[in-house]
A protein has these predicted regions:
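Helix-to-loop junction immediately C-terminal to a conserved catalytic motif
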Residues: 62
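ABC-family P-loop ATPase nucleotide-binding domains
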Residues: 85, 92-149
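Catalytic Walker B motif of ABC-type/P-loop ATPase nucleotide-binding domains
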Residues: 162-166
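ABC transporter nucleotide-binding domain
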Residues: 178-194, 198-256
Length: 288
């Protein structure tokens, strides 16, 4: 039965899309028939090949772009209606962005009226941990420093939905570690984070829900627990049901059906390659 957004009661804060499609007149569809539910209390990983539409999906969720067809709702609200109560609970950190020629302190003073739960003390603490001087002009910072400054501000806004597009690009190794720690402590049962990334290793330990997009739409959407219940990762034994395998520096690694319910360490990169190689086989297993 199809889901009717206009009449259903939303019982928890959630991003929902239904048959969401976006394309330019002169180009193929960038997104095709995306139906998703992303709930609070999770860090969602949004994965896909270059040009598959991950950034576009984030922009549609924010109302920066208008869908060609289909629907998107954030806590039951259409982003295109520009309702203040939705935008006060939603923030995006783009991969690339321009900030005014102000210090982080002055930028925060200018923007905090839009975010009722903004906490100035938290921003200063995050900035200090990320080694950002809140009095330095943003224009004078390197790309990595600007990104860390914006991350500090975004976390201090305490929004319920935080969207991040390649958040670790430009961060050095110590900053990535600090970023992971701050983000892990940010999410609670009333907040969600959606991370679009190619740098899976930077955030793999944070993700508890995985969404993989391909040219046909949503290739896979599952929690990490569901994935590890269905699949196992590692070296294949003689009787294993192998769905995908590849040669790595560590030897031949495989994605296999987890028939015996064994404990397994999720390998998101291997999972992504398996879904890309044979979407149908993975889908058939998850749909049983």
């Amino acid at each position: 039965m199809e889901h009717d957004f206009s009449t259903s009661k939303i019982v928890e804060f959630m991003i929902r899309t239904k048959n969401l499609t976006f394309g330019y007149r002169s180009r193929r569809k960038v997104l095709n028939d995306i139906t998703l539910e992303l709930g609070e209390g999770h860090i969602h990983g949004l994965l896909g090949c270059n040009g598959i539409g991950k950034t576009t999906l984030l922009k549609l969720i924010c109302g920066i772009m208008r869908p060609s067809s289909g629907e998107v709702r954030v806590d039951g609200i259409d982003p295109m209606t520009r309702q203040p109560q939705m935008f006060s609970e939603l923030m995006i950190i783009p991969e690339e962005f321009d900030l005014p020629n102000l210090s982080l302190e002055r930028y925060a003073a200018m923007m905090k009226p839009f975010y009722p739960r903004f906490d100035h003390g938290s921003m200063r603490r995050y900035a200090e941990e990320l080694k950002v001087n809140t009095e330095d002009k943003l224009h004078n910072m390197s790309m990595g420093q600007r990104k860390k400054a914006y991350i500090a501000f975004a976390l201090a806004c305490n929004v319920r939905t935080l969207l991040m597009d390649e958040p670790t690009n430009g961060l050095d190794i110590p900053s990535k570690s600090i970023f992971r720690r701050l983000l892990a402590s940010y999410v609670d049962e009333e907040r969600m984070v959606v991370i679009s990334t190619h740098q899976v290793a930077d955030v793999e330990s944070l993700l508890d829900n995985i969404v993989i997009l391909d040219n046909e739409g949503v290739a896979l959407a599952a929690t990490t627990t569901e994935i590890c219940n269905k699949l196992k990762f590692g070296r294949a034994e003689e009787n294993d049901s192998v769905l995908y395998k590849e040669t790595t520096i560590a030897g031949e690694m495989a994605v296999m059906e987890n028939r015996a319910g064994e404990d397994t360490q999720l390998n998101i990169e291997l999972l992504f390659n398996a879904v890309t190689a044979d979407r149908k086989a993975i889908n058939n297993l998850f749909n049983r």
